[in-house]
């Protein structure tokens, strides 16, 4: 029998001790105290942070919202059915975020980035982890809004222009065409996408029926708008937490494009439902309620979301220093990008002075107000020009449009006043009669059918005729027919004129061409 040397034993023991890793993987784990209505209270997570992601043992994720003395209140991003009292919950040490890359374009996702369109998983191998909640860019990193965002809607582009980086509220009662304006704007970006100057669109559906979202996606597909669009959907059947976080997911995706020097448009449809979801979550978390039972910080909820829309400074060295930049974007930031927001608010019986509508009006850079009465009279889009406004104004218009449509808003407001008085008087002077006639005809010109956005060059040509009274020989009921004939001639015989107008140039030779064509077309109606 061989003798074992003591020195060999000590060497073997020493080798084994050295091979043991000293690193230990600690996980902070808590237990579920209570769970109800999409909210769970967890005991034991003493170091949990606000907005941190938590993972339950069955794989369900949750986000920390309340930090209390003895427990943590969190909202569940899934069903509560598999979660029981005493179940273990662990910290992920990650702030709530969404993974984003270009493969998301053309897809329908939920607020945590999972595909819900049945087209398989999205390849997120090379993706950016964008935080859902993030501070808005500071004043130094912004620039004044000066580039137009063309909606293709005559009434908007001429009288309530929207610029890249602006927040323009769309407000009105149900069934007045709010979503239609947003969808038309998305469809109108197709020409820019084809020219290689895309405006990426994010449509956020909050608390809508799944069938409504499916119909909208189908509409976007039919008009070729999905290749540059991402739809984020938290439907009515999803938990309140999902509806609450959906707009933040949309903003995070928009920031991914904005901070890389690209242009993005995000539509929140609609923020009234997000406020209701936030109220629901807050009341279950036992937060003190305020006016209309909304929590006291409901204004801050919308302001911090909408302030994330911005036109970023074009100077590269300034843009790179942007505040609260996610780690994944450091060194990849490009200046000059923009994120435009079109929040939608639903009013009850035209009451614009309610709590949430007044909050959002005070945050945004203007509003497009839609009226049921105008909609029912057949004026669509049913925009009330009198109280709709864009606080960016002419700086978000091309020069030709600014020149042609400069007085259109005032003219239409005056026409509305005169029309109200004309109902009471039988005789009127020639000037008043002419103003009323021109107003009625311009009203007809501004009517536009859904899903048919008009290129800006064609808009300028039509509005030049309208504001200069060149449709005078045409009866009011034939105005739209005459407009279509006029545009047909312009497209076939003078495409260069329309192209030049679209580039913002207008001179005497161009106006002479327009006047000649409209005289020939309008002459047929004498």
Positions of PLM-derived features:
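Nucleotide-state-sensitive switch-loop elements of NTP-binding domains
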Residues: 199, 209-253, 283-295, 302-307, ...
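Acidic-enriched and Gly/Ser
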Residues: 2-16, 22-25, 31-149
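Phosphate-binding/switch loop-helix module in NTP-utilizing enzymes
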Residues: 242-278, 330-331
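Walker A/P-loop NTP-binding active-site region of P-loop NTPases
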Residues: 164-215, 270
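Conserved catalytic/coupling modules of large nucleotide/cofactor-utilizing molecular machines
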Residues: 256, 273, 280-526
């Amino acid at each position: 029998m061989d003798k074992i040397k003591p020195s060999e034993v000590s060497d073997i023991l020493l080798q084994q001790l050295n091979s043991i890793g000293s690193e230990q993987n600690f996980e902070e784990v808590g237990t579920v105290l209570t769970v109800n209505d999409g909210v769970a209270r967890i005991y034991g997570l003493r170091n949990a942070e606000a907005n941190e992601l938590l993972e339950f043992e069955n794989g369900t994720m949750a986000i920390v919202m309340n930090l209390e003395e003895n427990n943590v209140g969190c909202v569940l991003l899934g069903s509560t059915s598999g979660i029981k009292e005493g179940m273990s919950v662990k910290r992920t040490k990650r702030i709530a975020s969404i993974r984003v890359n270009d493969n998301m374009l053309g897809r329908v996702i939920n607020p945590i980035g999972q595909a819900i369109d049945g087209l398989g998983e999205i390849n997120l191998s090379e993706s950016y982890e964008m935080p859902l909640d993030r501070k808005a860019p500071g004043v130094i990193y912004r620039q004044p809004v000066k580039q137009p965002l063309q909606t293709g809607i005559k009434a908007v582009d001429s009288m309530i222009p929207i610029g890249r980086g602006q927040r323009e509220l769309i407000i009105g009662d149900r069934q007045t065409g709010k979503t239609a304006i947003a969808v038309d704007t998305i469809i109108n970006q197709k020409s820019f996408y084809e020219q290689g100057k895309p405006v990426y669109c994010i449509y956020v559906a909050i608390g809508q029926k799944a069938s409504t979202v499916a119909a909208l996606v189908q509409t976007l597909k039919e008009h070729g708008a999905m290749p540059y669009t991402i739809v984020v959907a938290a439907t009515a059947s999803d938990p309140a937490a999902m509806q609450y976080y959906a707009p933040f997911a949309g903003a995070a995706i928009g920031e991914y494009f904005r901070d890389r020097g690209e242009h993005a448009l995000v539509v929140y449809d609609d923020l009234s439902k997000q406020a209701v979801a936030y109220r629901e979550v807050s009341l279950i978390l036992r937060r003190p309620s305020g006016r209309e039972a909304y929590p006291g910080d409901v204004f801050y909820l919308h302001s911090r979301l909408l302030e994330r829309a911005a036109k970023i400074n074009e100077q590269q060295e300034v843009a790179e220093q942007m505040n609260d930049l996610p780690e994944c974007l450091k060194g990849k930031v490009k200046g000059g990008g923009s994120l435009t927001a079109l929040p939608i608010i639903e009013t009850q019986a035209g009451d614009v002075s309610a709590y949430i509508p007044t909050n959002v009006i005070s945050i945004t850079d203007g509003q497009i107000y839609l009226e049921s009465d105008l909609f029912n009279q057949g004026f669509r889009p049913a925009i009330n020009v009198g109280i709709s406004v864009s606080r960016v104004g002419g700086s978000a218009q091309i020069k030709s449009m600014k020149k042609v449509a400069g007085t259109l808003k005032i003219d239409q407001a005056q026409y509305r006043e005169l029309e109200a008085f004309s109902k009471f008087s039988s005789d009127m002077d020639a000037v008043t009669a002419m103003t009323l006639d021109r107003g009625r005809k311009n009203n007809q010109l501004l009517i536009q059918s859904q899903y048919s956005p008009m290129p800006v060059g064609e808009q300028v040509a039509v509005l030049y005729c309208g504001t200069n009274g060149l449709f005078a020989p045409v009866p009011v009921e034939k105005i739209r027919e005459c407009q279509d004939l006029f545009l047909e001639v312009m497209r076939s015989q003078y495409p260069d004129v329309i192209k030049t107008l679209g580039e913002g140039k207008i001179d005497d030779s161009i106006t002479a061409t327009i006047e000649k064509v409209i005289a020939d077309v309008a002459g047929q109606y004498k």
